[in-house]
Curated annotation (Swiss-Prot):
It catalyses: tRNA(Gly) + glycine + ATP = glycyl-tRNA(Gly) + AMP + diphosphate. It comes from Streptococcus agalactiae serotype Ia (strain ATCC 27591 / A909 / CDC SS700). Keywords: Aminoacyl-tRNA synthetase, ATP-binding, Cytoplasm, Ligase, Nucleotide-binding, Protein biosynthesis. PROSITE patterns: AA_TRNA_LIGASE_II_GLYAB. The keyword Nucleotide-binding applies. This is Glycine--tRNA ligase beta subunit. Tetramer of two alpha and two beta subunits. InterPro entries: DALR_anticod-bd, Gly-tRNA-synth_bsu, Gly-tRNA-synth_heterodimer. GO terms for molecular function: arginine-tRNA ligase activity; ATP binding; glycine-tRNA ligase activity. Its EC number is 6.1.1.14. The gene is glyS. It is an enzyme of class 6 (ligase). The keyword Metal-binding does not apply. One of its GO terms (cellular component) is cytosol. It is found in: Cytoplasm.
Amino acid sequence: MTKDLLLELGLEELPAYVVTPSEKQLGQKMVKFLEDHRLSFETVQTFSTPRRLAVRVKGLADQQTDLTEDFKGPSKKIALDAEGNFSKAAQGFVRGKGLSVDDIEFREVKGEEYVYVTKHETGKSAIDVLASVTEVLTELTFPVNMHWANNSFEYIRPVHTLVVLLDDQALELDFLDIHSGRISRGHRFLGSDTEISSASSYEDDLRQQFVIADAKERQQMIVNQIHAIEEKKNISVEIDEDLLNEVLNLVEYPTAFLGSFDEKYLDVPEEVLVTSMKNHQRYFVVRDRDGKLLPNFISVRNGNAEHIENVIKGNEKVLVARLEDGEFFWQEDQKLNIADLVEKLKQVTFHEKIGSLYEHMDRVKVISQYLAEKADLSDEEKLAVLRAASIYKFDLLTGMVDEFDELQGIMGEKYALLAGEQPAVAAAIREHYMPTSADGELPETRVGAILALADKFDTLLSFFSVGLIPSGSNDPYALRRATQGIVRILEAFGWDIPLDELVTNLYGLSFASLDYANQKEVMAFISARIEKMIGSKVPKDIREAVLESDTYIVSLILEASQALVQKSKDAQYKVSVESLSRAFNLAEKVTHSVLVDSSLFENNQEKALYQAILSLELTEDMHDNLDKLFALSPIINDFFDNTMVMTDDEKMKQNRLALLNSLVAKARTVAAFNLLNTK
């Protein structure tokens, strides 16, 4: 016989970003609890609103499964003393299992007898096991916790209710300072406390109190309501997924509505309006069917449609205050002078250990010129890079960016154009922040890409130089994101600049404001970002092999990893890799540089391998390079079958090692083949 279990925790309003991850955690913890306690079940369904986290288990067994376990103990010679009595070791072993020496039997394992005991445990009733089910709530982890009242414990938010039902039976349990029952809270304004009749009636009972417990249902309600407004008003609404996920976790009973604002604010840059609505007010942006921004917005109320006109007016009033600020800053910032703002950056700290933003820009200016040369930019582009690097942080001191920091770079571009800067310069000011996430948009222009690289390189090297190196998951200065951006930009723009050479040359630059340090750590950090870019779907041994190659060009490293993944499916992969790996391992025994002397060859296999290596011409086509290297496998194996490399003749040995080393030197431009797994 099976039953349904419901566990609901009622809390003060949770931060929106915590709700969905916590709901997911709760489901995972419940599954683990049931599996660990040998309670079978059919399905687990989770629920969440800003004021509750809940999980329902359907088809829960009424009793644990019985358990029979065999335990292996000490060997017989240790378990018995000289008189044939059970030793203290044997007695201690069975006592630890809750058994006695009468339960001991001996079993032979690989020719030797060992103590074995078999423990039988009859399954407990589900009611008894569920006495500790609140463990799943204790085990939930949150970004931050809080204390309340005079309690010694802490949790994400104060807890008000706990409901634990097995079908319609309320279980008597405690969690923190709350005793369980069947009382749950309805909507804060429209509902009231309500009894949950049974685990199966959970959603319906709460719906009567204006609470939609299922997040997916709430989300669909919002989407349907927005679509209905779209159809009625002949408009188009941007349903941003992140915003939708946030909004659904701000409401328990959603009602979408259309608001408006004065058309005069459309003279303010669109980005300001969108940021005000979307980021600050959690409103959905409204456009006409051609994509033109309209003086409207859609918001979602936490409640029903009653007195919705008052809610609309209130939301419009709040938004207008934001738009007034935007309009004011837009007009006032245009009175500022870029040169004056750049000069003031001398007083703005980049980091207390590193210096000012002005000094950061000075270093970026030098780095960007070096990179522009390496990337073979035109003279016109180089001039644009130089100008952009000289001013690109000025907008940080504008009123608009101070109020809306999400618009840094975006407003810089607009103000630069108004001040008469070249479009390439203005675009670079915006693009130097790109990408802003692991899969964010990249710069579109070469000038912007070079400035982005220079800014990110100086940021990386500066923080590493003063010892501010990320550890574990801690990365307060977003250096991983900056480095990922470097790798992505180099690959996307096809700038095949070897990273080891590039970083070494950057470390060779001299600045009065800062001396770069920790080059080795920087290179390791960059390699880790390249590995991240290669992706976890590529086997770990392949990732390691290409990162340990002598190739430091991002695009070639990525291509080599894909080529190896493709080749690993071939029947000859194992044989080819093993032959090259053997050469790699022997080449490590080279103690000093020796030129291959063909006059010392004793057999045709040495000559054949020597000629094959001389004829081996590798290019920047990693797939072709692998084909050529794998084609050598029969020649390499023939060499090993007929040649003693580690001969007693020292001169002969060093010559053969040098021969293999010449092969490895070429092969290592693709991968360190000895790191590949062929088992």
